[in-house]
Swiss-Prot record:
The gene is ttcA. [4Fe-4S] cluster binds at C134, C137, C225. Residues 1-20, 282-305 are annotated as: Disordered. This is tRNA-cytidine(32) 2-sulfurtransferase. GO terms for molecular function: 4 iron, 4 sulfur cluster binding; ATP binding; magnesium ion binding; sulfurtransferase activity; tRNA binding. Belongs to the TtcA family. Pathway: tRNA modification.
């Protein structure tokens, strides 16, 4: 008689993964992605040189906290030595928790300075109630930070602008100023004395927000300009968020396009010599009519018109 073997029992479902462990792994992957993107931006634009003293402008927002955190992590394994100093500008805003940043930075063991300058009173006095304060506030803030950098041997000034800031600035310039311009990942400061770098240039704002939440940074809200509604940047930001929801990857494509400019396919005569295009190499340039003659011809009228 042939033995009847018992049917194999179905394998039990694996035990559900611990949600805390899964969250930790996701946060670890996020941190590594941000480090990789920051390192790539630094390499692509030559942001950091050996011996640089980098001033990290720390506002107390998620972006600047993430910037400092990334640079501290990269500093430990960077191919070149550089130093960091975190600098916060105390603008004397009402109810500003002045103790938060010093306590946080002391806990990290990071060299830091608090620059006190009452820009709040200046802005409040000059700007009418209900008007946007961001532009004037930004200029005053830059002046104070540049002055500190000048007197303390700073060679690079690191700002926390991210990919979405850069794309938003592009559209603000396009919509409101009729020019194609954004934020450069690296540029000369307004006073001409320093180089400004934006190591978060490749990082999405959503990733920064998630990272800041995971790291539990002590976020300080901006009560001066960040809470004002209907600002141009907020409007553009909402547009970008809508695009990300409806067409994932569109904002990333726009960001990449900022690094692939084709002057010959635009209309800026200072970037491309349209007058020389199509001109015979043997034809003397003196035979070309004065461009102003075409303008005069365009204005000419006849009795039959």
């Amino acid at each position: 008689m042939t033995a009847v073997l018992p049917l194999p029992q179905p394998l039990a479902d694996p035990a559900p993964r611990d949600p805390r462990q899964r969250l930790q792994r996701e946060q670890l992957r996020l941190g590594k992605r941000l480090q990789r993107q920051v390192g790539q931006a630094i390499a692509d634009f030559g942001m950091i040189a050996p011996g640089d003293k980098i001033m990290v402008c720390l506002s107390g927002g998620k972006d600047s906290y993430t910037l400092l955190d990334m640079l501290l992590q990269l500093q430990r394994k960077a191919p070149v030595p550089f130093s960091l100093v975190a600098v916060n500008l105390d603008q004397k805003q009402p109810d500003f928790p002045a103790h938060v940043l010093p306590a946080y930075l002391r806990g990290l063991g990071v060299p830091f300075a608090i620059v006190e300058q009452d820009t709040y009173s200046v802005v409040s006095r000059v700007i009418p109630a209900g008007k946007t304060m961001c532009s004037l506030c930004s200029r005053l803030r830059r002046g104070a930070l540049y002055a500190y950098a000048q007197t303390h041997g700073v060679t690079k000034i690191a700002l926390g602008h991210h990919r979405d800031d850069i794309v938003a600035t592009f559209f603000m310039n396009l919509f409101h100023h009729a020019r194609l311009a954004a934020m450069a990942p690296k540029l000369r400061s307004d006073d001409g004395a320093h180089v400004v770098i934006r190591p978060l240039a490749y990082v999405r704002e959503a990733d920064i927000a998630a990272y800041a939440q995971a790291r539990q940074f002590p976020i300080i809200p901006c009560n001066l300009c960040g809470s004002q509604e209907n600002l141009q940047r907020q409007q553009v930001g909402k547009l970008l968020q809508q695009w990300d929801r409806e067409s994932p990857g569109r904002v990333e494509q726009i960001a990449r396009a900022l690094g692939d400019v084709r002057p010959e396919q635009l209309a800026d005569r200072t970037l491309f010599d349209f007058l020389a295009l199509g001109r015979s190499g043997d034809a003397p340039s003196g035979l070309d009519p004065d461009p102003r003659a075409w303008l005069s011809a365009g204005h000419a009228t006849h009795d039959s018109d």
